[in-house]
Amino acid sequence: MKNKIKIRLKSFDHRSLDQATKEIVSAVKRTFATINGPIPLPRKIERFTVNRSPHVHKKSREQFEIRKHKRLLVIDDPNPAVVDALSKVDLAAGVDVVIELESGE
């Protein structure tokens, strides 16, 4: 039976995301566990187009975009020290973390 921990990180700022992945990877490597990643997932770009003027000048528009960056980390055969190290990692405020535990049979 092989267990895995999948950690998905999401952020609007790629610099804070890369810093968070470095902190997680170094914390896991201190426990001598095997880690795969960081695997960069496709970024999602949402674009919004709005009129500059509320009344006339339909051709005058402004465009905005939001870029969502994502990374994936996979830890193979985690031990209790890995879970303890992950709970003590302090990450930046703009990084969203989703942790999944996968048990293989």
UniProtKB/Swiss-Prot annotation:
InterPro entries, per the entry? Ribosomal_uS10 (IPR001848), Ribosomal_uS10_dom (IPR027486), Ribosomal_uS10_dom_sf (IPR036838)
Single GO BP term: translation
Q: Which keywords does this Swiss-Prot/TrEMBL entry list? A: Ribonucleoprotein, Ribosomal protein
GO cellular component: a single term? ribonucleoprotein complex
Membrane-crossing ranges are none
Question: Which Gene3D superfamilies does the UniProt record give?
Answer: Ribosomal protein S10 domain
Q: Which GO terms describe its molecular function?
A: structural constituent of ribosome; tRNA binding
Query: What PANTHER family would the database entry show?
Result: 30S RIBOSOMAL PROTEIN S10 FAMILY MEMBER (PTHR11700)
Q: Which family does it belong to?
A: Belongs to the universal ribosomal protein uS10 family.
Subunit text = Part of the 30S ribosomal subunit.
Job description of the protein: Involved in the binding of tRNA to the ribosomes.
What's the protein called, per UniProt?
Small ribosomal subunit protein uS10
- What organism, scientifically named, is this protein from? Rickettsia prowazekii (strain Madrid E)
Tell me the organism's taxonomic lineage: Bacteria, Pseudomonadati, Pseudomonadota, Alphaproteobacteria, Rickettsiales
Q: Which gene encodes it?
A: rpsJ
